[in-house]
C-alpha cells in the first residue's frame, strides 16, 4: 500500500511538472492571448493596436455560426444593400456585392420591416426574393444553411475602426484564466458585463477565446464560444418556433 502511495505521488508530480514545463514553454503565447482579450475590452485604440501589431498578415478571425444566407449589409443605410458575400455560404454564387433586396417571399422590403423578413429560420428551406443588380430587377432563390464568416486581418482592422470609440467595451470584465495545450493552442476564459443601448438592460456572459499562433508568435487563428442564449434571455428575448 505504501509503495502504491509513493507511485501515485510520483506520477502526480510528473504530471504537474509536465504541465508547468508546457506552460513555461508557451508563456509568451499565453501572455499575448490574455493581453489580446484585455485590449479588446479596454478601448478601440487598444484593440486596433493589438491586431495591427500581433495578428499574422494571413491570420483569420472566426465569427459565431448561424443559419442564414451568408451576406453582410450596412444597417445604417437605406434598404438592404450587400456589402460582402461570405465565401462557401448559401449566398455565394447567387448574390454579389452591390445587390439590393427589394422583395422577400412576396413582401416588399422597407426600412421598417427589413429585420423581420424570412432570412432566418430552418436550414434547407428556400427563400424567394427579388434584387436589383446593375439597375435591373432579378428574381433569386436561396436555401438557408450554416454560415461562418472568416475575417481577414484587414477586415478585422476595418471592423474595429468602424466601431464607436465612445461606447466601446463592457461595463466590467475579468480575465479569469488562460491555459495551453501541448500543441501550443491557447484558451482564455473571460467574463464581461454590458448594457444594451436600446433598452438599458444589463447582461453578462462567460466567453472562451481560442488562439493559434504561427512560427513567429503572431495570432494565426482566433475564435470565441460564448453564452449567446443566456445573453438574449437576460435582454428579454425568447426562442420561438
Give, region by region, the residue ranges found by the protein language model.
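PDZ/PDZ-like peptide-tail recognition elements
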Residues: 22-27, 34-84, 117-120, 142-143, ...
Amino acid at each position: 500500500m505504501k509503495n502504491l502511495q509513493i507511485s501515485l505521488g510520483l506520477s502526480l508530480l510528473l504530471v504537474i511538472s509536465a504541465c508547468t514545463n508546457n506552460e513555461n514553454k508557451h508563456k509568451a503565447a499565453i501572455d499575448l492571448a490574455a493581453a489580446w482579450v484585455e485590449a479588446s475590452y479596454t478601448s478601440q485604440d487598444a484593440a486596433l493596436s493589438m491586431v495591427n501589431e500581433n495578428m499574422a498578415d494571413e491570420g483569420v478571425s472566426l465569427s459565431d455560426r448561424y443559419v442564414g444566407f451568408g451576406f453582410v449589409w450596412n444597417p445604417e443605410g437605406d434598404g438592404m444593400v450587400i456589402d460582402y458575400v461570405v465565401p462557401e455560404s448559401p449566398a455565394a454564387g447567387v448574390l454579389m456585392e452591390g445587390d439590393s433586396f427589394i422583395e422577400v417571399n412576396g413582401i416588399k422590403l422597407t426600412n421598417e420591416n427589413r429585420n423581420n423578413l424570412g432570412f432566418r429560420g430552418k436550414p434547407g428551406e428556400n427563400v424567394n426574393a427579388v434584387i436589383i443588380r446593375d439597375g435591373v430587377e432579378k428574381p433569386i432563390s436561396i436555401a438557408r444553411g450554416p454560415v461562418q464568416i472568416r475575417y481577414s486581418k484587414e477586415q478585422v482592422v476595418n471592423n474595429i475602426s468602424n466601431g464607436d470609440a465612445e461606447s466601446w467595451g463592457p461595463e466590467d470584465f475579468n480575465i479569469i484564466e488562460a491555459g495551453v495545450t501541448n500543441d501550443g493552442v491557447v484558451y482564455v476564459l473571460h467574463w464581461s458585463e454590458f448594457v444594451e443601448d436600446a433598452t438599458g438592460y444589463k447582461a453578462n456572459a462567460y466567453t472562451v477565446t481560442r488562439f493559434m499562433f504561427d512560427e513567429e508568435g503572431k495570432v494565426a487563428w482566433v475564435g470565441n464560444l460564448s453564452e449567446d442564449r443566456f445573453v438574449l434571455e437576460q435582454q428579454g428575448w425568447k426562442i420561438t418556433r
